[in-house]
């Protein structure tokens, strides 16, 4: 692997770990609660769905 590719991978991992820390500390800015039109007060969350992806959690395990 070239030096540039290694640096990009390290930077991506660092950003991912920092984003995960922020996600645990407080809800994300993109998590907007929206009430549905039905009578029950179900809330849909938009944004940051990639944080719960199985591929990302597998990458963070090593």
Swiss-Prot record:
It is found in: Secreted. The modification Tyrosine amide is found at residue 46. Its main location: secreted. GO terms for cellular component: extracellular region. One of its GO terms (molecular function) is toxin activity. The keyword Translocase does not apply. Coiled coil: none annotated. Residues 1-19 form the signal peptide. Expressed by the venom duct. Keywords: Amidation, Cleavage on pair of basic residues, Neurotoxin, Secreted, Signal, Toxin. Disulfide bonds: none annotated. This peptide does not show activity on human and mouse sensory neuron-specific G-protein coupled receptors MRGPRX1. Belongs to the FARP (FMRFamide related peptide) family. Negative results: the mature peptide does not contain cysteine residue. This is Conorfamide-Tx1. It comes from Conus textile.
